[in-house]
């Protein structure tokens, strides 16, 4: 199934991996393929019908080839853990991020229709909140920067009465 999609999109198989991982395993993913940086960022949108009391969460996964950060705004302090790190660290991430890419695909996963719609999209792309944090985190991987933050063990317990 994926092989046909890759052929229709006219992209190398390796480049499709972050999108596939995000679709199958969830989360954001990045990969360096030869001279190409590839990143998948997942956005969740919940739709709920108040009258019928039923809804679904649409997942939009964006695949970016050679993404570039155009702008970042704000600072959010948050806990993150990545790969070979033993525990989470306190890191700074932008609240808003604008990026562009040489090539971008948007995959929309709808659990109600059981369809994955794919289309080529043009930037720039604006993300805020957790999606902006994901962009920042994955760009660190692509730029081969090690995530650095304050160790979690510097937290202190506080009992409120």
Residue positions per predicted region:
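Positively charged
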Residues: 1-161
């Amino acid at each position: 199934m994926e092989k046909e999609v890759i052929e229709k999109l006219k992209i190398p198989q390796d480049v499709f991996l972050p999108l596939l991982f995000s679709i199958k395993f969830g989360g954001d993913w990045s990969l360096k393929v030869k001279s190409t940086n590839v990143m998948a960022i997942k956005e969740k949108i919940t739709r709920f019908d108040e009258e019928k009391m039923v809804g679904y969460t649409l997942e939009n996964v964006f695949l970016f080839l050679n993404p570039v950060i155009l702008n970042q705004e704000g600072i959010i302090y948050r806990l993150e853990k990545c790969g070979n790190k033993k525990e989470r660290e306190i890191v700074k991430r932008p609240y808003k991020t604008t990026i562009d890419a040489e090539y971008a695909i948007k995959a929309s996963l709808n659990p109600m229709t059981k369809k994955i719609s794919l289309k080529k999209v043009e930037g720039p792309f604006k993300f805020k909140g957790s999606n902006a944090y994901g962009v920042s985190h994955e760009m660190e991987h692509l730029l081969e920067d090690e995530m650095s933050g304050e160790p979690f063990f510097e937290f202190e317990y506080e009992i409120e009465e």
